[in-house]
Amino acid sequence: MAIKVGMVSLGCAKNQVDGEMLMANLKNAGFELCDDAALADVAIVNTCGFIDSAKQESIDEILELATLKKEGRIKKIVVTGCLAERYREEIHKELPEVDGVFGIGANADIAACIESAMNDFTESFPEKSKMPLCGERELSTPSYFAYIKIAEGCDNKCTYCAIPMIRGGYRSRTMESIEKEARGLVENGAKELILIAQDTTRYGIDLYGEYSLAKLMRRLCKIDGLKWLRVLYCYPDALTDELLETMAEEEKIVKYIDLPLQHASARVLKRMNRTGDRESLTALMKKIREKIPGVTLRTTLITGFPGETEEEFTELAEFVKDIEFERLGCFAYSQEEGTPAALMPDPIDDEVKNHRAEIIMESQMNIMDRLGEKQVGGDITVLTEGFDRYAECWFGRSAMDAPDIDGKVFFSAETKPYYGEMVTVHVDEAIDGDLFGTRA
């Protein structure tokens, strides 16, 4: 009788893709896949280890499954992903309920690892480079959109970030493998493809000797049936004119740039091992908007980095007000063991860090309210994602919104749309970052 396996995948979309490949490997090896890990023989926790809150979420999930194991509802618990890669010894020592701990390099041999864990505690930590860059996936997203991971690892070495330690150096996939996967996804119903990596803008530098994201995107735009092509996790240093021109010219590429800037103070950015200052970043945002009219700019910021003064925080807050990003996320700095920033002097009190993040987000909500009002009275294209039974209306995303991190468009419709259908919605109202309207 086949062993039933179920997965809980935590963290970012990149980790989600890893989990999808892992589950496909298990299916091909004869395991029975279970949608609910609580109903499986083996529960896999695909963990995130990026910041403290993500680590805690991973630990909480393991402990919740441990309760089910104690009750006899599941037989084994195995842990994979970033937390497993980074804290292998601690997991074994502090969480005795866990039957297997596997690093990211073990994904290719996950079937053998789990079979071993059925008999005795097992751990496997091959070289990170052994993690396959591509492969068959058991998709966890709806059929109408999918992520494509175009590279693994990171070479940027930001002082606050543990990803290079966890994931290793930057490794790009070939254009041919990405195009093949993209065509398969579109043939199976995907209307939107979302390119992801730790740093998408450096795609190809290791394979082709030059930044090749623009060439890749032009190639993907030729796929019949693809409606939207979106790219996340761009890095400001590598945002080339060729890429901006490609985004402006290609109709299938949504006019949306996710550009995590982290800060605007030159001193803070230098301590983060990032380049730029308020003036240069302001100029870059202006350039993007000039080259791509109507673009949606999304960024991510960090408050409370060690040594951040009131003046430097004020500079960041003023920068946010001046630029008026269409989408923005802000997080209090989380100290990561083993990173240079963890050893820096002048740490900021948690209460101060969190308060500064709240100030930024409050300011951003005011900006989004004003920008949302400008949408009222107009028509937008919406990718239908579901029906809200409480509000008795449909909802979906516009080209201005990426899954999970951005807002929604809620709309009424006399003609029932199907999931994944692209419909035109007349915007009647904007509230708290979401739009409300009627199918045109």
Predicted regions and their residues:
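Proteins enriched for Cys/Gly/acidic motifs involved in redox and nucleic-acid/cofactor modification
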Residues: 1-203, 242, 253, 257, ...
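Radical SAM enzyme [4Fe-4S]-AdoMet core and its adjacent flexible, acidic
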Residues: 12, 204-225, 271-272, 335-366
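Active-site proximal loops enriched in glycine and acidic residues that flank catalytic Cys/His/Asp
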Residues: 197, 233, 261-263, 299-303, ...
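Extended hydrophobic-aromatic, low-complexity segments
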Residues: 255-256, 269-270, 281, 293-296, ...
